[in-house]
């Protein structure tokens, strides 16, 4: 009987933690500036710098050539950073 109660408690605890994690993720998405929805913008300068941006249409981080100045905040040095910041799946 105690084993069944302990297992039930662990199951409920696991479900609560998962729900809390999901709610926190949704809250973060709502609080973050909508940087990930900005269009890719290379900027006015002519330097060629490989960067990553989140393509809101495809839901993927994609490579682009950044000019070195200007642009917007949808501009990441590494694909991993882009995915960490913009992909909530």
From Swiss-Prot:
UniProt subcellular location: Secreted
A Pfam family per the record: Kunitz_BPTI
Gene Ontology CC terms, in alphabetical order: extracellular region
Domain of life of the organism encoding this protein: Eukaryota
Disulfide-bond pairs as recorded: 36-86, 45-69, 61-82
Ranges where the BPTI/Kunitz inhibitor domain occurs: 36-86
Span of the signal peptide: 1-24
GO molecular function, one term: serine-type endopeptidase inhibitor activity
CDD domains associated with the record: Kunitz-type
Family matches, as InterPro entries: Kunitz_BPTI, Kunitz_BPTI_sf, Prtase_inh_Kunz-CS, TFPI/VKTCI-like
Gene3D superfamilies, per the entry: Pancreatic trypsin inhibitor Kunitz domain (4.10.410.10)
Coiled-coil regions, chain positions: none
Keywords tagged on the record: Disulfide bond, Protease inhibitor, Secreted, Serine protease inhibitor, Signal
Name assigned to this protein: Kunitz-type protease inhibitor 3
Gene that this polypeptide is encoded by: SPINT3
């Amino acid at each position: 009987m105690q084993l069944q109660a302990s297992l039930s408690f662990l199951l409920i605890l696991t479900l609560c933690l998962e729900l809390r994690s999901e709610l926190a993720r949704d809250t973060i998405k709502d609080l973050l500036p909508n940087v990930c929805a900005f269009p890719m913008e290379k900027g006015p300068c002519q330097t060629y710098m490989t960067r990553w941006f989140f393509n809101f249409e495809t839901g993927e981080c994609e490579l682009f050539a950044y000019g070195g100045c200007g642009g917007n905040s949808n501009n990441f040095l590494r694909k991993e950073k882009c995915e960490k910041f913009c992909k909530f799946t």
